[in-house]
Amino acid sequence: MKIQTIIQIVLISFLFLNVESKKINCLHLQQDECIKNKDKCFLSNVNSCCEKDFLMCLPISSKYCESQTDDVFSNKNILKKSPPSSSHEWCLKKKKSILRFNTSCVPELDLDSEYFKPNLYKCKYSKCQKGFKCVDEKLHKKCETENNPCCKYESKCVPSKDIDQNEAPIFKNPKGQLAQDIYNHLNPDSPQFKDKPNHENHKKDKNNKKHKKDIKNNSDKNNNNNNNNNNKKNKTINNNEPNQNQQSNPIDRTFNNETPFPWNFKNQDQQQQKQEQTQKQTQKEYFKAGSPYPVLPNLNKEPTTHLNTIEPTSFTASASRYQLEGNDNKDEENIDENNGEDKKKKKKKKKDDKSKKPKDDEKHTKKPNVTEQPADDPSIEITEEPTITPSSSPVHQDPCKKATCPNGSHCLVYGNQAYCKLDKPPNYQTMSPLPQKQQPSVKKMDSLSMFYKKSKMLLSEYTTEQRPQLTCSTIKCEDDEVCINKVGLNPYCQIKPPPKPVSYNKTSCSQCPIGSYRCNPNPNGSGVICETDAINCRLIACKEGEFCIDNIENTPPKCYPKLLCNLSKIPPDYYCISDEIRGGFYVKYESYIDLSCETLLCEGVNSYCVENGGPICKTWPNDTIQYQPSCDKCPKDTMSCTPNENSNNKGVVCRIDRPSCSVIQCPDNQYCVNTDKGPKCYKRSIECSNSRCPRDYTCKRDEIRGGACLKN
């Protein structure tokens, strides 16, 4: 007996270690390990604005975040209406930190966090999905990561106020009270399999419904006959009769068809007994459900109390799934035994035939299956019977009950954590697809400030790619401008100084270079001086894929490779414009120029600007003389009003002498604008090379004003 007890303890200890070893903490896995465990973990690429990009291993199966998303986009009917894959981007913000998740799943948020969808344009030109509202909020972070829409947007879609609490709508409990009781007792603290009920259980729904009433009646019947049945069982065990298997355990095992386990409870009030029994029964049933090995009988006939220390949260998912699949037949057999005396007699006859076989042979020859528990062993002594009934299932909280997800998404529980998942791709018309990011080089991990609640993450961090440098070959200056490239500053354009001719000392004019326009005698000595213009790009032929630049300060004309906007990595605060000669060039983004009489260009000698809810260009009449019936009808800028000398026309003659910018001289660095209230001087502040006009307007370079917005 002692040897058997020692063997049992060793096997149980090994089982405990094996169950613990199968626990996987996705948050602590590296990239390769996270990919290998994709049935439990999901590798998500996370982009931050002012930090390095990194990979995060989320504790949720990849099939919830990848397969379902791919299946939706594989539908040809939806594919025609669905936006690009970037519509699955979530922007998570807390205080000054912003992260982008390019997945349909996001971690659970705390009260200080918010998630939103970025828009490239303002709400006037953007559209949000149902359950979201658009808010104009402009953000252009200086330390933004390239091509990260969460760091650079004009507006955002945020959850609207009419968000209702989501009670995990995707969860579907197994049909039938029997299957539900089995699930509740085998998985008291783990709701992650509720969303995928077993298909075999659904096939047996009709049988479960058929026995639903029998379970309730039998539970009441068994509670009344507990004392008598227990005495019969004890008598059978002590006598060791050949028909010992005929007397079945009177405990109703509608939720537990495994090998009976020793109970150790005290007879107390029913409410207190249920609470204590629920906790202990949960731990014992977990051990049986999660065990990949058969449960050995208790050979020493003593209750084993050391198993209660096992944490119920560390059970194996596969074992509980197998147990749920294989229990229905056994449950139906146990229920049939209690339906009537006729069924009991039939069961006893079958058991009598089986009991004739020697127990030792059966014990040594038949090896129990991993997914099946061995038959009842009469050597186990049940000291007291539990008062718990199948209808009293353990109470466990659903994380989705406290979670709030916006319309268009639903709550998903995995690993005792709540996630908000999109039901279908949202209808975003403003999102632009992101280019595929190349695999960056690995660098030593820096400390990142993560803002997730109860998260301990080991991040596989990667360095961001080097940002492109601005040069005079990637920006465009006008023909009369020169590009200045100083150390520590971005290149800029300024007015080109007058060209200086190039002189050559030659012995005669015939030796002057081609293109020389002047040949004069040398006043200092013999020979001549040949004068020619500096060499320019018109005299240089570049090879294919290059272009020539000759307006770089202190740099001779040179060929540079063309810039392709679709393949280039655009610097922050810049956008790329295609060009036939240069291939493309960068233009700096700045705030939209506010339209006013100061920034609006009104072309024409008699044009002037009127501030009337917005600048408007109007034109004065060409005539400076108007005929009016009386002097009070003359314009405000009338200098004189005289009677009409023409006898044919009655009235007065209004002589107009308008003050205009033609007679106004503004201070230095200022320019004059004709308005309806007279000429005004404004400070020169606009440069078309680094400014943008609003839509339907173009920035026109002007020598006096520097630049102004002209309506298209």
Swiss-Prot record:
GO terms for cellular component: extracellular region; spore wall. It comes from the Eukaryota. Residues 220-251, 270-281 have a biased composition (Low complexity). Residues 399-421, 471-494, 596-618, 660-682, 687-710 form the Follistatin-like domain. Residues 254-269, 301-321, 386-395 have a biased composition (Polar residues). The keyword Secreted applies. Residues 192-203, 352-364 have a biased composition (Basic and acidic residues). Glycans are attached at residues 102, 217, 234, 369, 407, 505, 524, 566, 622. Pfam families: Dicty_spore_N. Residues 181-400 are annotated as: Disordered. GO terms for biological process: sporulation resulting in formation of a cellular spore. Residues 1-21 form the signal peptide. Keywords: Glycoprotein, Repeat, Secreted, Signal. Residues 330-339, 374-384 have a biased composition (Acidic residues). It is found in: Secreted. Residues 204-214 have a biased composition (Basic residues). This is Follistatin-like domain-containing protein DDB_G0289517. The lineage of its organism: Eukaryota, Amoebozoa, Evosea, Eumycetozoa, Dictyostelia.
